[in-house]
Amino acid sequence: MERQLEAYCAHLRNERQVSEHTLLGYRRDLDKVIAYCKEHGIADWQALQIQQLRQLIARLHHHGQSSRSLARLLSAVRGLYRYLNREGLCQHDPATGLSAPKGERRLPKVLDTDRALQLLDGGVDDDFIARRDQAILELFYSSGLRLSELTNLDLDHLDLAAGLVQVLGKGGKARVLPVGRKAREALQAWYRLRGIGNPRDRAVFITRQGNRISPQAVRLRVKAAGERELGQHLHPHMLRHSFASHVLESSQDLRAVQELLGHADISTTQIYTHLDFQHLAAVYDSAHPRAKRSKGNDS
């Protein structure tokens, strides 16, 4: 089973061009399935049946795994079995018809517009790290990139004169996104210190040693910026969520936001309509003279 899993992971990495972060998530989930199979004497993928997979899901749910995590595990299992069936290594899919237990869908955390501007409009030292980090923050918020999309950017993916960036999203799907004026200015300032012709790596964002910056390093730099400028926890995906929420709030164009984010299914994008409603409700509560009743006037 491990050998076939290794072959599947190699397929995802080399042919599907899945990011290392996503690949590690798939591997962790499928390792749980292998551990369950070993525990129950299941020697190969063909022998795993729907009843056993359902039992594993129930056990993990009982031990506190979220519905979202279990849905991701089932998605990983389905992907593996699609590969095994296509390669003639298996003739069924035990995940067919299975779904994760329903859970409450949490709304993504976002910065409001004022907080986003507070983060980005602070003073920036004219040094290598500060200029790089500012360009990272501006590009996340300007274009709504995923972490893997940002760290995989090469110099020829950006056209600052045209204000465009080409990214490779999930499933190897390419899309072209606009880059705002402030982000272009931050990138130009970063390029002056980066030394375009010197470092070995063609990555847009590099370390002092000239190597492509890692996703973990970006997470730490974004976290540090959030603590320094806002006094709060901040992660790259919160900037992507903020980008989506603010564009939707201004444009009311859900399809456009779907395209910008690279979502295959618009239902994934629709969660931002709930955030927009929360904003509208807050505006209503603060602005409408009869939106709130004072205490003691409830009779």
From Swiss-Prot:
This is Tyrosine recombinase XerC. Forms a cyclic heterotetrameric complex composed of two molecules of XerC and two molecules of XerD. Site-specific tyrosine recombinase, which acts by catalyzing the cutting and rejoining of the recombining DNA molecules. The XerC-XerD complex is essential to convert dimers of the bacterial chromosome into monomers to permit their segregation at cell division. It also contributes to the segregational stability of plasmids. GO terms for cellular component: cytoplasm. CDD domains: INT_XerDC_C (cd00798). Belongs to the 'phage' integrase family. XerC subfamily. Keywords: Cell cycle, Cell division, Chromosome partition, Cytoplasm, DNA integration, DNA recombination, DNA-binding. One of its GO terms (molecular function) is DNA binding. Residues 1-85 form the Core-binding (CB) domain. The gene is xerC. One of its GO terms (biological process) is cell division. It is found in: Cytoplasm. It comes from Pseudomonas putida (strain GB-1). The active site is at 146, 170, 237, 240, 263, 272 (o-(3'-phospho-dna)-tyrosine intermediate). InterPro entries: CB, DNA_brk_join_enz, Integrase-like_cat_sf, Integrase_catalytic, Integrase_recombinase_N, Integrase_SAM-like_N, Recomb_XerC, Tyrosine_recombinase_XerC/XerD. Disulfide bonds: none annotated. The keyword Cytoplasm applies. The keyword Cell cycle applies. Residues 106-285 form the Tyr recombinase domain. SUPFAM superfamilies: DNA breaking-rejoining enzymes, lambda integrase-like, N-terminal domain. Its main location: cytoplasm.
